[in-house]
Swiss-Prot record:
Source species: Methylobacterium nodulans (strain LMG 21967 / CNCM I-2342 / ORS 2060)
Recorded family membership: Belongs to the UPF0102 family.
Domain of life: Bacteria
Molecular function terms from GO: nucleic acid binding
Name of this protein: UPF0102 protein Mnod_0024
Pfam families reported for this sequence: UPF0102 (PF02021)
Length: 129
């Protein structure tokens, strides 16, 4: 069996590509709202942040979720994901000390087929260390 014949490998690749597409769509939606990208797929401290965006004095750490429905996307951010996300956000802040004086928040963008992405401001609190 070749790699392309493996159904599990095909599913993983499709999921990976769907995630990248959702992140690009989320980025476009946020750009149209006046945000500037600072980082994409920032990984550190056992967590990952899909997008780090800035608008004025706000730094938004953005989790992008693509699911069949917007409600399913919202439900996909569980406590474990929030903890890992918060660890990565603290690592990003430590590497960018200039950001400490700005408003920092955790946003989410939910993406569903044939729908414009939904941006949820302050979707959850960044957990302290």
């Amino acid at each position: 069996m070749t790699r392309t014949d493996d159904p599990a490998a095909r599913r993983r690749r499709a999921t990976y590509l769907r995630g990248h597409g959702a992140e690009r769509l989320a980025l476009l939606a946020l750009l149209l709202k006046g945000y500037r990208p600072l980082a994409r797929r920032f990984a550190a401290a056992g967590g990952e942040i899909d997008l780090v965006m800035r608008r004025g004095s706000v730094i938004a750490f953005v989790e992008v979720k693509a699911r069949p429905t917007l409600d399913a996307a919202a439900a996909a951010i569980d406590a474990r994901k929030r903890r890992a996300f918060s660890r990565a956000a603290r690592a990003w802040i430590a590497r960018h000390p200039w950001s400490a004086g700005l408003t920092l928040r955790a946003d989410a963008v939910f993406v569903a087929p044939r729908r414009w992405p939904r941006h949820l401001v302050s979707a959850f609190d960044l957990e302290p260390s």
